[in-house]
Design a protein with these regions (language model features):
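Short, low-complexity N-terminal intrinsically disordered segments enriched in polar/charged residues
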Residues: 17-43
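Generic anion/oxyanion-binding catalytic loop in active/binding sites
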Residues: 8, 38, 55
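Short solvent-exposed beta->alpha transition segments
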Residues: 31-32, 47-100
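Bacterial Sec-dependent N-terminal signal peptides
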Residues: 1-21
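Exposed beta-sheet edge and beta->alpha loop/turn motif
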Residues: 89-151
Length: 151
C-alpha cells in the first residue's frame, strides 16, 4: 500500500509543481504588463493604454471615448505619487468569459488629488497569448463626503 501511495505521489507531484510554476510565471508576466499599462495611463499615453485593452473590451468602447475618459480620470486623480502591489491571483475560468488564462491584480495607489485609491485590474491572454486588459476599476474615499459625514 505504501508503495502505491508513493508511486502516485511521484506521478502527480511533478505535475502539481509544474502547474504552480506556470501560474507564478503568468502572474509575473501579467503584473509587468499591468505596470506598463498603468504607466501609459499615468504618463498620458492614452492611445497606448487603449491598445492594451482586450478585443472583447474594444467591441464595446471606441478609442476616442476611452482616451477622453482616461484624460478626465487622470485629471481627477492628479499625478501618481506611489503605487503598491497588494494582491495577485491566477484563475483559469471566469463566468461569461469561459476558460482561459486570467490574472486579477489589486494595487493601492496614492495620487496627488486622491490620498488613497484602490485599483483593480483583470487581464487575460488573447488568441496571440498576449496579456490584455479585460477590466480596470478603482475605488477611493471622496474627501467631500468624508467632511460631510463628520458634521
Amino acid at each position: 500500500m505504501i508503495n502505491k501511495t508513493s508511486l502516485l505521489l511521484l506521478l502527480f507531484l511533478p505535475q502539481l509543481l509544474f502547474s504552480q510554476i506556470f501560474k507564478e510565471k503568468y502572474i509575473t508576466e501579467a503584473n509587468e504588463f499591468c505596470t506598463n499599462w498603468l504607466s501609459n495611463l499615468n504618463n498620458k499615453s492614452y492611445g497606448k493604454a487603449y491598445n492594451g485593452f482586450h478585443e472583447k473590451v474594444k467591441l464595446n468602447s471606441d478609442s476616442l471615448s476611452s482616451c477622453n475618459a482616461f484624460s478626465q480620470l487622470m485629471g481627477e486623480f492628479g499625478t501618481l505619487n506611489s503605487r503598491k502591489l497588494d494582491t495577485t491571483f491566477f484563475q483559469s475560468n471566469i463566468e461569461e468569459l469561459g476558460d482561459g488564462f486570467y490574472v486579477f491584480i489589486e494595487y493601492t495607489s496614492f495620487y496627488k488629488k486622491i490620498d488613497l485609491c484602490q485599483e483593480y485590474i483583470i487581464v487575460g491572454q488573447n488568441d496571440n497569448l498576449k496579456w490584455k486588459i479585460l477590466r480596470y476599476d478603482f475605488s477611493y474615499a471622496n474627501e467631500e463626503l468624508n467632511k460631510e459625514d463628520k458634521k
